[in-house]
Amino acid sequence: MHLNNNERIDDLEYKDLKIIQRKDGFCFGIDSVLLSNYAKDIKRGTVGLDLGTGTGILGILLCGKTDLSKIYGIEVQQEVAEMAQRSVKLNNLENRFEIINKNIKDLESVFDKNSFDFIITNPPYKKMDTGKTNENSKKLISRHEITATLKDFIKISYIMLKDKGTLYMVHKPERLVDIIYQLRKNKIEPKEIRFVHPYEKKEPNLIPVSYTHLRAHETELH
């Protein structure tokens, strides 16, 4: 497998899956692993979208943990998308995981509306005018809402999900109000919200959440 400068192959320690990452780029964290575990109820034969796939970590893990039929990883950065595609090939997942170099806001030119059983995403957590910015452009796009905002991620999820399809997302607790507001605007109902604490007696720092498209649910809090 060809590696570019500053790239390495990391072992995911699960079913012999591996991933290519840049030493100076944005590497996956525990949030992606938690989200892939949270979405293990994805049903056999379903088709989904991974919005902002980055290195392809979520799609690769889901191919190993579920019997999904096909998942499309959408990545706006061309160099990152090309690297993710090599990771797909490295794991022999070409028939199940396809990388598309596109801004999520432009997906209506690629797919029909209401085409997907599920959508999974680990979007940028920070608004552009908040938090410490990183001079590395690739890391900056991964962490801050530069090419797409939370509103954009939820809006395109509404457009692309089938009726009763599921959206899986991980985000920060401080954005929960924004998330619920945008979901309600787009007729997506929260189904389950979990608060993840890094240590006992510490405040939660992550919230994996599942949402259902156009279907009322009693929200479960954990």
Model features per residue range: what roles?
Residues 2-42:
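Class I SAM-dependent transferase core
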